[in-house]
Amino acid sequence: RGVAIVGVGLRLPGGVDDLESLWDTLIRQVDTLRPIPPERYDMASLYDPDPDARGRSYVKHASLLDDVASFDASFFGISPREAAPMDPQHRLLLEAGWTALEDAGIPPDTLKGTTTGVFIGMGPNEYGQHRGRTPGDVDAYDVTGSQMSFAAGRLAYHLGLQGPALSVDTACSSSLVAMQLATEAIRAGKCEVALAAGVQVLANPQAMVLLSQTRAVAPDGRS
């Protein structure tokens, strides 16, 4: 059974938000690497070029999205209270998923009640730590807005889908695994259409510090 990619939604570093801008970035060999800004997290106090320095990171550059917190919550029927603790990864999935359907020429409302599936490859939630919430501050929206398990369900719920919806974290291969699962589901007849996505937002320095301890990242931040 043949499977085709019919639409794409992108949110990538360097202002890339469609295939045309992605192609332009590649052709012009645009370098999207930049110093991690303090509004993302305070990398300056954690940086140390010595890879053996405990509790420090020898990386201070990354390719990052601009204005990652920007989100039109009302467009998706989400209240300000619910949107505030929502992991930017959830927000990006909603936006990119909607864009992918538009790019495919599929009116989103025509998928309501169908067996369309949602398959998400997602990085860990760092936004909760970034916000610095305490147990006394949290409410139900801190749970629904932060857990990886809710990410695929949120997109499926918004579109009224009845197909399989799941999120996976297989580290660097998460996006490819999501695409493979979507392909298998279509070929098995579990769904006619599938949204497959990958998302990761660096919002807390802890992962960078831990990866530096294992020397799993390049000093220049490129891999």
Question: Where do the language-model regions lie?
Answer:
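Cys-dependent condensing catalytic cores that perform Claisen condensation/acyl-transfer
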Residues: 1-223
